[in-house]
Swiss-Prot record:
Pfam families the UniProt entry points to: RRF (PF01765)
GO biological process: cytoplasmic translational termination
Domain of life where this protein originates: Bacteria
GO cellular component, one term: cytosol
Family listed: Belongs to the RRF family.
HAMAP family: RRF (MF_00040)
Record's protein name: Ribosome-recycling factor
Length: 187
């Protein structure tokens, strides 16, 4: 039988890091009352027959703490960009000035801040679930190797490795959530 089982923990870590990267992208899309170019990243605009991110249609700048500007390169795209922002659900009212779209970021009220912290919590839970799914995949590989004949000591060693990696990544998610919630609640 096989006693030389080697679990690819680098692959598990890479997949868990992918869940974390996805969480950071989702967190960036949450409006905190502070202007940020990354808040526009999830918004796609119908441009030249395909959906395109705003940063590929114009230059996104943050000239003031509560203002984002987009200098649209193609004048014919200004209306489409404005429409995409209005329909994005960010609660931002674009103002046009030629090919420049100005996005004043209003202050968040207490109720909206609480809603956003709940949404951030949901995003974090999705990341935790994704990390646990990777853990389950790793544990399944270990069980399969156990059936193929690895020793019980090796099985316990690899299970502990996978669990340690999982616990570490869950702590990273929790810390990111705590930071994001504090940022959202800051007035």
């Amino acid at each position: 039988m096989s006693d030389d089982f080697e679990l690819d923990t680098d692959d598990l870590k890479r997949r868990m890091d992918g869940a974390m990267a996805n969480l950071k992208t989702e967190f960036a899309s949450l409006r905190t009352g502070r202007a940020s170019g990354s808040m526009l990243e999830p918004i796609q605009v119908e441009a030249y027959g395909q959906m395109t991110p705003i940063n590929q249609i114009g230059t996104v700048n943050v000239p003031e703490p509560r203002m984002v500007t987009i200098n649209v390169w193609d004048k014919s795209m200004v209306g489409k960009v404005e429409k995409a922002i209005r329909e994005s659900g960010l609660g931002i009212n674009p103002q046009l000035n030629g090919t420049i779209i100005m996005l004043p970021i209003p202050e968040l009220n207490e109720e909206r801040r609480r809603e956003l912290t709940k949404v951030a919590g949901q995003y974090a839970e999705h990341a935790r679930v994704a990390i646990r799914n990777v853990r389950r995949d790793g544990m399944d590989q270990i069980k399969k190797a156990k059936a193929d004949g690895i020793s019980e000591d090796d099985q316990k060693f690899w299970e502990a490795e996978v669990q340690e990696l999982t616990d570490k990544m869950i702590k990273v998610v929790d810390a990111a959530l705590e930071t994001k919630q504090a940022e959202i609640m800051q007035v």
